[in-house]
Design a protein with these regions (language model features):
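N-terminal module-boundary/linker segments of secreted carbohydrate-active enzymes
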Residues: 1, 108, 302-306
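Aromatic-lined, polymer-binding surfaces characteristic
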Residues: 2-229
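CBM-like carbohydrate-recognition segments
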Residues: 207, 228, 233-306
Length: 306
């Protein structure tokens, strides 16, 4: 879990998904593998930063849920796995808990921390924790009344819409720009400002950064889990997640289209967004879409989200 680029969680998720689709004899062996690997992962978070834990942990929690760990291994679930998950509520990783990371960082750090935070809340069916995390996510999608405590990098302010900047000298951005946002007359509707600022101050045409799809990778996992628990997350922020991908695809006014052809471990963002909105981003890719590769925190979505 301490390796920010580790992919083991994706393969644990694959074993869990295959296990629930096969006959009982083969399935039992795969489920045992999942439990074994989860056990081996415990403790590997020592020395990690919050981003690494945020990226890696969710897949293990989702895999445990898929195989119904409380039913097949109640002893391991109660005495090992659940106490470990509970520890993440207060444990600090380079000064941040998953909770404070989601609440402070309006970028890929925060979205991945939020995904693991929400996955844990879902596993425990902790409605209070999930509601609190959902409020932060709704704020991330643009509703400052829901939450507005994010700390932006200085360059992010140059990507904020002209309307906001004209309204007050103290204008505060929202992590995903609102519908119709413009900067100097250029379309920035849906820009994830604290990831796009990795390219520097506002410039046009804008430059590509893989941090934008990286941030959306954590966001779609948050939205997917929250939706399963009754939150209308895909509609929040005037369909902010769809608008964010639309801006990446926007190819007018000298801005090139940015899909995930050269960024395969972000392909799952397009699968999940298409599944949620009935959109066709996969069909609109510049390359022939391949089956989804291991992602930043989940994977195999070209199979699970058809």
């Amino acid at each position: 879990l301490a390796d920010v680029d580790e992919e083991t969680g994706n393969f644990v998720l694959a074993k869990a998904l295959v296990a629930v689709r096969l006959d009982s004899k083969v399935s039992a062996g795969l489920k045992d593998d999942v439990v074994k690997i989860i056990g081996q992962a415990i403790g590997t978070e020592n020395g990690a930063n919050a981003l690494a834990v945020g990226r890696n942990l969710a897949a293990y929690v989702i895999a445990a849920d898929i195989i119904d760990l409380p039913k097949i291994r109640p002893d391991f679930d109660e005495s090992v796995f659940r106490p470990w998950l509970r520890s993440f509520a207060t444990r600090k990783f380079t000064g941040r808990t998953l909770r404070s990371c989601q609440e402070d960082r309006p970028n890929n750090w925060g979205t991945h921390c939020g995904a693991s935070r929400i996955a844990i809340a879902a596993y425990f069916n902790d409605q209070m924790e999930m509601t609190q995390a959902a409020s932060v996510f709704q704020g991330w999608l643009g509703d400052r009344r829901s939450y507005s405590g994010f700390k932006f990098g200085p360059e992010a302010f140059s990507w904020v819409s002209d309307v906001c900047l004209r309204s007050a000298s103290s204008c505060q951005p929202v992590p995903v720009n609102p519908r119709g946002a413009l900067v100097n007359g250029h379309n920035v509707d849906g820009v994830v400002v604290d990831d796009q600022r990795r390219t520097g101050e506002f410039t046009w045409p804008p430059k590509y950064t893989y941090y934008s799809y990286g941030g959306l990778g954590g966001a779609v996992v948050q939205a997917g889990i929250l939706h399963r628990f009754g939150f209308d997350a895909w509609q929040w922020g005037d369909r902010a997640l769809k608008r964010a991908v639309e801006w990446m695809y926007y190819d007018g006014d000298r801005k090139p289209k940015w899909d995930t052809c050269d960024d395969a471990n972000k392909r799952y963002v397009l699968d999940v967004v298409d599944h949620a909105y009935g959109s066709n981003f996969i069909e609109r890719m510049n390359c022939a879409p391949e089956a989804s590769k291991p992602g930043r925190n989940i994977a195999w979505t070209s199979w699970t989200h058809q």
